[in-house]
From Swiss-Prot:
PROSITE patterns: GST_CTER (PS50405), GST_NTER (PS50404). It comes from Mus musculus. Belongs to the GST superfamily. The gene is Gdap1l1. This is Ganglioside-induced differentiation-associated protein 1-like 1. The keyword Protein biosynthesis does not apply. SUPFAM superfamilies: GST C-terminal domain-like, Thioredoxin-like. It comes from the Eukaryota. InterPro entries: Glutathione-S-Trfase_C-like, Glutathione-S-Trfase_C_sf, Glutathione_S-Trfase_N, Thioredoxin-like_sf. Residues 177-344 form the GST C-terminal domain. Gene3D superfamilies: 1.20.1050.10, Glutaredoxin. Residues 45-129 form the GST N-terminal domain.
Amino acid sequence: MATPNNLTPTNCSWWPISALESDAAKPVETPDAPEASSPAHWPKESLVLYHWTQSFSSQKRLQVRLVIAEKGLACEERDVSLPQSEHKEPWFMRLNLGEEVPVIIHRDNIISDYDQIIDYVERTFTGEHVVALMPEAGSPQHARVLQYRELLDALPMDAYTHGCILHPELTTDSMIPKYATAEIRRHLANATTDLMKLDHEEEPQLSEPYLSKQKKLMAKILEHDDVSYLKKILGELAMVLDQIEAELEKRKLENEGQTCELWLCGCAFTLADVLLGATLHRLKFLGLSKKYWEDGSRPNLQSFFERVQRRFAFRKVLGDIHTTLLSAVIPNAFRLVKRKPPSFFGASFLMGSLGGMGYFAYWYLKKKYI
């Protein structure tokens, strides 16, 4: 069952417009910038999207939903609950042996890779009434979209997320609850001891590959806890945002005197804008926006973010995420880890709940402690 679209964001004063169902009935009218087309144009071409509606660990999952919404496609969303291990059920493994979400089905096609899903949707759904997110091949705009897709996809979003959770002193007005850092650090403090104990104890419910995965997971979180490493990658992020700021300035100079709305690669809204909007949204959530654009240092980036937030697809998809994350996922995560699971499971689970690493620990917690 898909998450309903009639939820209003809570505790998100910076989110400009709610995603109410009544509002979703009509796109925002922006001059010279057509919004997502109506799903009614594709009655027999609808997609089926299998995903976990409460998963915030991957930027690419968000991008898939935004692309579908921007193109205005009819899409039936079906929930695959990772906590209940539905991705390991035979019915889902028949769709994807890799046990990964999201997966889309269209006609007789089953696609599971993030980038392949985006490319398939863009390539397949075209026409007069459908927004094209990729410019014509061979055009300067097409080359720009490919360039910024590669650049934005390479950003280490999980490292930003873990680092900002563990070092809130580097953030301003983060949406992460203040109690999260202390609780996660409490679990991390005992994580190494717990892992050593499990190495010498028989745990029939834990296979060696699973335990190995947990060790790698903890090593990654501990690496992201290194302040010097975090400052290094945030410095590299600043250089990327400088490049994007300069690109947006070029668009202004190229189109001076024209009335079209300017985006990253030209007058048309493209896939590059979807990716940039999703990236800025995550950075805002983590408490990095005041440092990187709201301080006036990158006015073009700030203008871009304000405009992209007003788009119907972004209000619809991201409004639901705020509501679910703040009202359901985070509180439930902290209730679960209070039942005294091993510290390394508690730390990794809380990290996943706050948007970083995924839910490797949930199945074990649920089976052993609930």
